[in-house]
Amino acid sequence: LMDQGKIVGVLGGEHSTPLGLIEAIDSKGENFGILQIDAHADLRDAYEGFEQSHASIMFNALKNCKNLARLVQVGIRDVAESEIEIIKSSDNQIHTFFDWDLKEAQYNGQTWATQVDEIIHMLPQRVYISFDIDGLSPELCPNTGTPVVGGFKLEEINYLLFKLAESGRKIVGFDLNEVAPGNNSDWDANVGAR
């Protein structure tokens, strides 16, 4: 599909599912960046003994993809010390907009529009979007596997994505992961579909 100029997307339950697509985009030989919307950094080399897990997807993408120029993480609010060390030692290949930093700047008067401009400015011209639904506030996705207090409203993410499209950057692929409807409600699926 990519050879036909199509934008390929992956809908997965667990966040490790898009690694194959990210590697396929990398195999085209052109630099690209990843916009990761997530509560977690996903930079662990392994999680509970598994090297291919939802907690390792971005670690593996950085390790396997030689054309991945920049990883821009947005909304991260649950991070291990080892992941912070990876971010710090990445020579600016990883730029993380932590949830608490974004919120503190807003409390001090910075607008979401200004923050979105900063986020988009960090991205190269070709962008892959990786959206783990737990990047949203937990009341919007209470049944996801690892909800974390804090996060975004849906309209904030929609604004970010619209502004990314308006910026002239080329979207080369995307994923939406960790959407898990509950036993008594399809609320999470409804939010994920929007």
What are these model-derived regions, one by one?
Residues 1-194:
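Conserved alpha-helical scaffold segments that buttress catalytic/binding sites
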